[in-house]
């Protein structure tokens, strides 16, 4: 077998592989010898079929199997012998001429094919001792815990039916039919809908017009959908809602005690506070981690400058760009609405894709050298987390992971990345800094606004890219699946 390099430009490689017809003939004869005692051909005793007849009957199919095996197995072996790793699966090209293909299958012509691929760039790791980051630390006050516990209590608040007029804070149960230009519209009808007046859940003006109604009342409400309402067919339009009030209920007093905890399935009020404190710590810890990771990645980005494989960058960019356009379509907005242009947005996302690929390669190299591994238990937990997000679809999702090798890799990659960050945190200079909740959130909001100015869809659309780039864990999934259709007037569902 001859392996001839025909192209070596930057990271691009093209290899011509030639397997002489004689070698192919020898391999075919070996296979024929293996099967001659096993095949049954009319007119011949087992094992006595002449080689020429055996070749005539089985030669082409055996040769086709050989060709498939070579194309399947040799690329990896060739790259390994060259000490190269391809960025993506090599492209394989062979003759499409039928006459030439027949000659190859008849072992009358050399079998040739070409491999086209990009190699992963060599990365010489640098010392990370010079990386300095600040870890923001927050002391969670009892007042903040109590405030959150109160919100939990209010969400579980009981309501008692009243006969008087509805006031802000009361919950009404109602049926309604929404109409635009006298015609009912999709998502504008609901029965038994519950709404706490003053909650701001429904579009502006809707709740205000229900203050003062009583059970049994029928009322037509007129409102105007916001100009930026996600449903294009409703944005900026005047609508009427024919409302029938089924019940008015006043909120019961909220008391944080063991009885409340018991209703929530928790043994005591003290335990409830512990759980809430833990949730707050987790939320702040996640935010602190994101910002810490961003600092590390920014400095690694400054340290490493090398050519990135176009195939990886293009794949990353295409994924980001597809999500950006999906988000714009869902919101009914354009790039101009976000104070940018498509051309500028493309440039920014291309830069983001290049940065993410480069950092991904660096983190991969660091992790490999440090012996970072993802355990089977960690994979199982991550897959279980995925299953919990899609109740009722567990079997399909498990089958997807079993049948798609890349699916498991997509689960493994972020776990590996976080473990590499954990490793780096043991190697770099980390300084703790106490901050207030307001300082932490204000800084985060400022960064979000800065990103939004560049290209507003970025933070949401490129959430997956940002997970490696800026450590943001925001999902790029659709919002609430059914709520927008169920309650078009309900802004919180959008």
Swiss-Prot record:
Keyword Cell cycle belongs to the record: yes
Any single Pfam family the record assigns to this protein: Trigger_N
EC number(s) reported in the record: 5.2.1.8
GO cellular component: cytoplasm
Subcellular location: Cytoplasm
GO biological process terms, semicolon-separated: 'de novo' cotranslational protein folding; cell division; chaperone-mediated protein folding; protein transport; protein unfolding
Record-given protein name: Trigger factor
Classification of source organism: Bacteria, Pseudomonadati, Pseudomonadota, Alphaproteobacteria, Hyphomicrobiales
